Amino acid sequence: MKIRPAEARDRERIHEILVATAHFTEEEVRCAMELVDQAHDEPEKGDYFVHVLEEPDDGPVQGYVCHGPTPLTDGVFDLYWIAVDPKQQGQGIGQLLLRFVENEVRRKRGRMLLIETSSKESYASTMRFYERSGYDEISRIKDFYRIEDDKVVYCKKLTPS
């Protein structure tokens, strides 16, 4: 498997993965795709970086990740989106994508990676994934997204490489 910058040809597959996960609302999928488009259309801005993980020899894309620097901070980055084809989940693809982003952040002299997620029951495995990956829950805003759906913020401090 290899991780590479997303290209225009990956857009449809990224959309398919987001829809197939069944975690995201239509509005969330639209938001995620806006970041994919912005990363592709305005790379010089450096606001968003999108990468895909594909099988060797240009095989199908199995997952994608989007991250970028947090505005008005020194060395803080956000993981905006991470999604893996549901048929491929549990095979370490999410872990590979997350470690890739951590290494990219270190390479860019980043010191902290933040992840925001929902507290909905359907996200329980996602939250366990972040915790197993060394992220600490640092904030929880009750009823942020909607009643009984908190915003949970995870953080991992990184040592720049």
Outline where the language-model segments fall.
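Extreme N-terminal starter segment of soluble prokaryotic enzymes
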Residues: 1-2
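Acetyl-CoA-dependent GNAT
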Residues: 5-87, 95-100, 104, 108, ...
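Glycine-/small-residue-rich active-site loops that bind phosphorylated ligands and cofactors
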Residues: 24, 85, 89, 121-122, ...
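Short hydrophobic/aromatic beta-strand or adjacent loop that forms the aromatic wall/cage
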Residues: 48, 149-153
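Conserved G/P- and acidic residue-centered "switch" motifs that form tight phosphate/ATP-binding loops
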Residues: 92
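Conserved GNAT acetyl-CoA-binding A-motif
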Residues: 105-118
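Conserved beta-strand-loop-alpha-helix junction that forms the acyl-donor binding cleft
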Residues: 115-126, 144-148
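Conserved active-site tyrosine of GNAT-family acetyltransferases
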Residues: 129-130, 135
